[in-house]
Amino acid sequence: MNFFLDSALLGLEYALLAVGVYITFRILNLPDLTVDGSFTFGMAVSTVLCAAAHPFAGLLAGALAGAAAGVVTGFLQTHCKIHPILAGILTMSGLYTVNITVLGGPNVSLLDAPKFFEVLGGKAPAVGLVTAVIVVLVTLFFQTVGGLCIRAAGSNEDMVRASSINTTAVRWAALALANALVALSGAILAQCQGFGDVGAGSGMIVIGLASVIIGEVICGRRGIVIGIISAVLGSVVYRIIIALALRYNLMSANSLKLLSALIVAATLAVPAAAAAARAGRERKENRVC
């Protein structure tokens, strides 16, 4: 039982990463590769402030740092006219230097530093509470005018622009929110694992996508509320799957990122293959008719 609880707890620590990826990938319908950098940025800021005995300030500042990274990516996309994928790569690359500067080295230990969960009754209740509160707030936000504008921009940006809505501000807000959640996940993880590492963000975009896709397989794609909840659930299930694979020697620890990439690639390829098969059948039926 402890095995599953520990895996579920780790999944909750990464849950906000999955929600952030869900916002850009599904709601904004935009690929954002800033995630690897903003995750570590939030972790670095949280680590430094936690080491200075300010754990809660570390969480807040980590989230704000991620939001700033998202705004930079938005600026590159909207004002510099850089392709979204390249804009994310540029921000992510620049953040590596920022992160190692903030940490002051490749990693920092938090062994004797106070952690946010010590005040809230332990890791599980603290992480669960923070995740639940953030998920509720994000869900409520997407029912507001601002949230609806982001959802509309993801569906049809030209229509939103024709409605005299500032699409630049909408994109900035969406990227800031998504990367704030990703960075908050990194901030939480730093305090829960007891150290911050400059290489911790490697592959986070793939892990986030895998969590989102696993959640959609379980819950389906049925609206914004179910989508956000499914991202959290997908993160937990993903960690349980990985833990089971490692426990029963089905794969080595070095193969984790390969497994994540295969999950994402297969899940994204199946709908396209199914659509191609349907189109082929329809063409055959039309020729017969």
PLM segments and residue spans:
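Short loop segments and helix-boundary regions at transmembrane helix junctions
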Residues: 26-31, 69-110, 121-123, 194-198, ...
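Cytosolic-side transmembrane-helix boundaries in multi-pass membrane proteins
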Residues: 155-162, 166-169, 241-289
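Transmembrane alpha-helical segments in multi-pass inner-membrane proteins
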Residues: 182, 186, 192-258
